[in-house]
Design a protein with these regions (language model features):
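Walker A/P-loop
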Residues: 1
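Generic beta-sheet signal
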Residues: 42, 166, 348-349, 380, ...
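Short, hydrophobic beta-strand segments that form beta-sheet elements in well-ordered domains
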Residues: 20, 41, 118-121, 140, ...
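Conserved helicase motor core of SF1/SF2 NTP-dependent helicases
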Residues: 16, 123-438, 447-450, 454, ...
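PLD/PLD-like phosphodiesterase catalytic module centered on the HKD motif
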Residues: 424-617, 621-687
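Gly/Ala-rich phosphate-binding loop of Rossmann-like dinucleotide-binding domains
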Residues: 4, 28, 294, 484
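Conserved P-loop NTPase motor core of helicases/translocases
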Residues: 9-135, 175-187, 243, 317-320, ...
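Extended, charge-rich low-complexity interaction segments
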Residues: 65-85, 352-378, 522-525
C-alpha cells in the first residue's frame, strides 16, 4: 500500500492462485473504496468472493466497463441454443461470439496496463505478454520458497526500482523430481545463504524477519516455533482470546492441538492406480471430525496424498448437496492449501498397514522436506489442529525423532486431547445424520439388511477375511439371493473365497486385493464395516488384533463413485485358483468362472484353467499355472452352453424375465442373451 500511495506501479507475483487471491483481497480490504481498475487480479481466480466481485478481476472489470457486450453475448448464446448447427445464423453467431471474446480479452490487457496494482501467478506472467511487456516500479514475489531460481531472476527483471521476495524457507520447497544436486533443488533463501545464516544463529543483510504471527492460537504457534523456527516465532497478546471461541467448541473441546488415534482399527492403506495412497477408514474418521466442526466454523482437511484428497472432496460434495446450511469443508493436499487458512484443520496422515513403510511425504528428512510439508499443514489452522493417524503403525516403523509429525505424536500420546479408537467409535454417533451415520453391530445389521432389500440396480460387497457372525451371514445370503431373484446385480468379492462362510461362497468371487470391508448399493449408499469381519493386520510375521470395528453408513453418489474407482470394484472376474466347496464338500459351480475352474484343464500342463479379462474387456481362458505355463484359449459357445445345462435340461434363466439364456457368436465375439422378447444381455462375469 505504501508503494501505491507513493505513485508506484506494483506487480504482485506468487506461485499459486490461492496465494494471489488472498493477497489482492487483503489489499482491497485495506482500501475498499479505491477507484475500479486500480487493483486488478489477472488470470484464473479461485476465491468465491473475488469471482463475484464486480471489478477486482480483469474479466469482471472488462464486463463492468462494457456491460453491453455481456448482454449481447448472453442474448446470442440463448438464440444459438434454439438453432440447428447447419443454420447460417448459427455460424454467424459463432463468429460474433469470437469477436466479443477477443474484444473482452483486449480490454483485459488494457486493464493490466492501467492498473496501479496487478496480482497474478508467475506462470501467467511468463506466458502472457500483457504483464511481461508492462513496466512496474515494484515487484513483490510472495511464497518465494516454492519458486525456482530462474523464475525469481525473471521476476526481478520486471522491476524498475524495487524487488521484494517474501516467503518462509521452513515451508514448501520447489517441486523437483530429480534427486540430483542442482540449483533447481534450492529455494532463493538457500541460494542466497539466508537459510544457513539463520540455522547458525547469524543475521543476514538481505533478511527482514517477520517474527510475529496473527493467525494461529498460541499453542499451535508455539509448537511450530519450537520445532521449526528455533523459538523465534511469537504471537500477539490477544491471539489466545481471539481464538478461544474455536478452541472451546467441538470436536475435542478445550484443546487447540489434538489427535485421533486409529490404533486397533482396520484403517487399511492401499496404493491407487496412479501410485498415490488412500485409506478409507482414515478418510471417514477425519471427515466425521470435520463435519462436527463445520456446524460453527470454516474447516479444512489436509492430506499428503492426492487420491485421499479426492475421496475426501467427494464426501464434502455429497454433504454440501444434502446439507447446504453447513459451511463447505475444503479438502486438498498440502500444496493446494498453501496460502489459505481455516478455523479448524484436520490433518489426515493416511499411511498405515498394508504399506510396508510411510511414504516420503511423511518421512523424508532430506532438505527437511516432510517437516516443511507438515509445517504448512499445521500453520493453516487459526484455532484448532487435529492430527489423524494410526500411532501403533507409526511406532512400529520407528520414525525419526527429528520429524515434526513424530514430535506431535509424542506430545499428544495418552493425553485427554488424544482420542482412542474406543472414543472415536462411540463419540461419532453424536454426528449421525442424513448423510453420515455410525451404528453399533445389531443396529447396523438391521439397517444394512434394510438397504439390501431396498436396492434397485446393484449391490457390491467386499469382504477381507472371514465375517464374524455366521447367523448374520445366513441372513445376508438370503437377502442377496432374494435381490438376485429380482434381477439386481450382486457382486460379492472375497479376499479368500474358501475362508468365508459356506452360505456365501456360491455368491462370491475371489479377488486377493480386497482390503476394505466396503459395500456400495446402487452406487449411492456406502457401508464400511459390513458385514462385520474378523480381518486383522499381518505385519512382519506377526498378527495384530483389531479391537474396534466401527460400522459406518455414508450416503452420496460422489463418494460411492470415488470408492468404486479407487478399489477397482469393476474387477469382477473370479481369481480363484482352487475350486470352492460347500458344507458337504461338493464343488461350487454357481458362476461361470467357478465352473471353468472346476471343469476345464490346461492342455499343456493339466492344471485348471480360469477365466480372465483383458484390459480391453475381452474374456479368455488362462492357465492357473502361470507364470510357469502361458497357455491361453478363447471361450467358445459349447463351454458356456454346458455351464447353462450343468444341472439338467431346464438350463439357466434370465434373472429379469425368467426366459432361457443362450450363448451366441456375433460379429464382435461371444455374447449371452435371453430368449425373451426384450433380449436381455449379460457378460460372462454376470452369469
Amino acid at each position: 500500500m505504501a508503494h501505491i500511495e507513493q505513485g508506484n506501479r506494483v506487480l504482485m507475483l506468487s506461485y499459486s492462485n490461492v496465494s494471489v487471491d488472498g493477497a489482492i483481497m487483503r489489499v482491497h480490504k485495506m482500501k475498499p473504496n479505491m477507484k475500479p481498475g486500480t487493483l486488478v487480479r489477472y488470470g484464473y481466480a479461485r476465491h468465491k468472493d473475488l469471482l463475484e466481485h464486480r471489478y477486482l478481476t480483469s474479466y469482471n472489470l472488462s464486463i463492468h466497463n462494457h456491460p453491453e457486450l455481456l448482454k449481447e453475448r448472453q442474448d446470442l448464446i440463448a438464440e444459438r441454443k434454439k438453432l440447428p448447427r447447419t443454420s447460417p445464423r448459427y455460424v454467424q453467431i459463432g463468429r460474433r461470439l469470437t469477436q466479443i471474446r477477443n474484444e473482452l480479452s483486449s480490454e483485459e490487457k488494457e486493464t493490466v496496463k492501467n492498473a496501479k496494482f496487478v496480482a497474478t501467478t508467475v506462470s501467467k506472467t511468463v506466458v502472457d505478454s500483457a504483464v511481461r511487456d508492462c513496466e512496474f516500479d515494484v515487484v513483490i514475489f510472495d511464497e518465494a520458497s516454492m519458486a525456482y531460481i530462474p523464475q525469481i531472476v525473471f521476476a526481478a527483471s520486471l522491476a524498475k526500482k524495487h524487488f521484494v521476495c517474501m516467503g518462509d524457507f521452513r515451508q514448501l520447497p520447489p517441486i523437483v523430481q530429480s534427486n540430483g544436486i542442482s540449483p533447481l533443488n534450492a529455494d532463493i533463501f538457500q541460494y542466497c545463504g539466508i537459510t544457513s545464516a539463520v540455522d547458525s544463529g547469524r543475521n543476514h543483510k538481505w533478511l527482514c524477519m517477520l517474527d510475529t504471527q496473527y493467525r494461529m492460537h498460541p499453542r499451535i504457534a508455539d509448537f511450530a516455533s519450537r520445532t521449526m523456527y528455533g523459538g523465534l516465532l511469537h504471537s500477539t497478546e490477544e491471539m489466545e482470546k481471539n481464538r478461544r471461541g474455536i478452541v472451546d467448541q467441538k470436536p475435542i473441546t478445550g484443546h487447540a492441538m489434538a489427535f485421533a488415534d486409529l490404533s486397533g482399527m482396520m484403517s487399511v492403506c492401499t496404493k491407487t492406480g496412479d501410485n498415490s495412497r488412500v485409506n478409507v477408514l482414515s478418510a471417514l474418521m477425519s471427515f466425521s471430525l470435520a463435519l462436527e466442526a463445520a456446524k460453527n466454523h470454516e474447516v479444512g482437511i489436509i492430506t499428503p496424498y492426492h487420491a485421499q484428497s479426492r475421496l475426501l472432496h467427494a464426501m464434502a460434495r455429497d454433504v454440501a448437496d444434502a446439507n447446504p446450511e453447513l459451511k463447505l469443508i475444503a479438502c486438498a493436499t498440502v500444496h493446494q492449501f498453501q496460502g489459505s487458512e481455516k478455523d479448524v484443520i484436520v490433518y489426515d496422515a493416511v499411511d498405515c498397514y498394508r504399506m510396508p513403510y510411510p511414504g516420503m511425504l511423511l518421512t523424508s528428512t532430506g532438505n527437511s522436506y516432510a517437516n516443511r510439508l507438515f509445517n504448512v499443514a499445521l500453520t493453516r489452522a487459526k484455532g484448532k489442529f487435529i492430527g489423524v493417524a494410526n500411532i501403533a503403525y507409526m511406532d512400529n516403523k520407528n520414525l525419526s525423532s527429528s520429524l515434526m509429525f513424530e514430535r506431535m505424536i509424542e506430545g499428544q500420546r495418552r493425553k485427554p486431547s488424544c482420542l482412542t479408537g474406543q472414543e472415536l467409535s462411540q463419540k461419532r454417533t453424536a454426528i449421525s445424520g442424513s448423510t453420515m451415520s455410525f451404528f453399533d453391530n445389531d443396529e447396523g445389521n438391521r439397517r444394512f439388511l434394510k438397504d439390501i432389500a431396498e436396492a434397485r440396480r446393484e449391490i457390491r460387497i467386499d469382504i477381507p477375511d472371514k465375517p464374524v457372525e455366521d447367523v448374520f451371514s445366513r441372513q445376508l445370503a438370503i437377502a442377496l439371493q432374494t435381490a438376485k431373484g429380482k434381477g439386481i446385480k450382486v457382486y460379492l468379492r472375497a479376499e479368500n473365497k474358501q475362508g468365508i462362510p459356506s452360505v456365501l461362497r456360491p455368491l462370491a468371487i475371489e479377488n486377493p486385493f480386497v482390503a476394505n470391508p466396503v459395500v456400495l448399493i446402487d452406487k449411492k449408499v456406502v457401508w464400511f464395516g459390513m458385514p462385520s469381519s474378523d480381518a486383522k493386520f499381518k505385519s512382519e510375521g506377526s498378527i495384530l488384533q483389531m479391537r474396534y470395528r466401527p460400522v459406518i453408513r455414508f450416503e452420496g453418489a460422489h463418494t460411492a463413485a470415488s470408492l468404486y474407482g479407487f478399489m477397482e470394484m469393476s474387477k469382477t472376474v473370479d481369481q480363484s485358483k482352487i475350486v470352492s466347496t460347500d458344507e458337504e464338500g461338493k464343488a461350487i459351480t454357481d458362476t461361470f468362472a467357478s465352473y471353468v475352474l472346476a471343469n476345464k484343464k490346461c492342455p499343456s500342463c493339466g492344471k485348471p484353467m480360469k477365466m480372465q479379462k483383458s484390459k480391453k474387456g475381452k474374456f479368455f481362458l488362462a492357465c492357473t499355472g502361470y507364470p510357469a505355463c502361458h497357455e491361453t484359449a478363447l471361450i467358445n459357445v459349447d463351454l458356456v452352453e454346458r455351464y447353462f445345462y450343468r444341472h439338467g435340461d431346464t438350463g439357466q434363466h434370465c434373472t429379469r424375465c425368467n426366459c432361457s439364456l443362450e450363448a451366441k457368436l456375433g460379429q464382435y465375439g461371444l455374447y449371452i442373451q435371453c430368449c425373451g422378447s426384450q433380449r436381455h444381455r449379460y457378460k460372462l462375469d454376470e452369469i
